[in-house]
Amino acid sequence: MSKKAIYPGTFDPFTNGHLDVLERALNIFEHVDVVLAENSQKQTLFSVEERFDMVREVVRDLPNVSVDVLREGLLADYARQAGASAIVRGVRQVKDFEYEFQMSLLNRHLYPEVTTVFLMPNVKYTYVASTIIREVSMLGGDVSKFVHPYVLDQLSRKRAERRAH
C-alpha cells in the first residue's frame, strides 16, 4: 500500500491551520498531494487558479508535497488514480467531524482501499476558518497571524480590488 495521501479542500484561502494539518500529515505519509476542489456549490473569493498559486507558494519549501486541482469528478476516483492510500481531513470541532465522518464513509464505499485520516490542528488554529479569515480581511482586520505573508498580500489585493469597484 502506498504511503501517499491526498489533502483535499477549497482552501479559500489556505490558512496556517491548513498548513499545520499538512505538516502533521507529512509526519505520517511519505508524500501528500494538496488537492484544490473546484466546488460549484461554494462561492469563493479567489479563483481556483489564484488558490492554486497561493497554496503552491506556501508549500514550495516543503519536501514531498505537490499541489493539484480536482476540476470535476469524485474525490474517491481522484484518490484511486493518484495511488493514494489515505485522504487527510482537518477537524477543528465536533461540527466538522459530523460532516467529515459522513464523507469518509461514502469515500470508503466508493474506494474501499482508501482510509480517511482525521487530524486536529494546533489548538491555536481551532477557531481559524477560511470563511472567517476572508470576512475579517475584507473588512480591513488584521489576519497576519493566521495566514502566510503571500496569502496576506493576496487578501490585501482582493480587498483593494473590491474597494475600487
From Swiss-Prot:
Main localization (coarse): cytoplasm
Pfam families hit by this protein: CTP_transf_like (PF01467)
UniProt-listed SUPFAM superfamilies: Nucleotidylyl transferase
Entry keywords, A to Z: ATP-binding, Coenzyme A biosynthesis, Cytoplasm, Magnesium, Nucleotide-binding, Nucleotidyltransferase, Transferase
InterPro entries in UniProt: Cyt_trans-like, PPAT, Rossmann-like_a/b/a_fold
Gene3D superfamilies in the record: HUPs
EC number in record: 2.7.7.3
Binding-site residues, ATP: T10, F11, H18, G90, V91, R92, E100, Y125, T126, Y127, V128, A129, S130, T131
Pathway terms, separated by semicolons: Cofactor biosynthesis; coenzyme A biosynthesis; CoA from (R)-pantothenate: step 4/5
CDD domains: PPAT (cd02163)
Sites annotated Transition state stabilizer: H18
Binding residues for substrate: T10, K42, L75, R89
Cellular component GO terms held in the UniProt record: cytoplasm
Enzyme class: transferase
Function: Reversibly transfers an adenylyl group from ATP to 4'-phosphopantetheine, yielding dephospho-CoA (dPCoA) and pyrophosphate.
Family: Belongs to the bacterial CoaD family.
Name used for this protein in its record: Phosphopantetheine adenylyltransferase
Source organism (scientific name): Chlorobaculum tepidum (strain ATCC 49652 / DSM 12025 / NBRC 103806 / TLS)
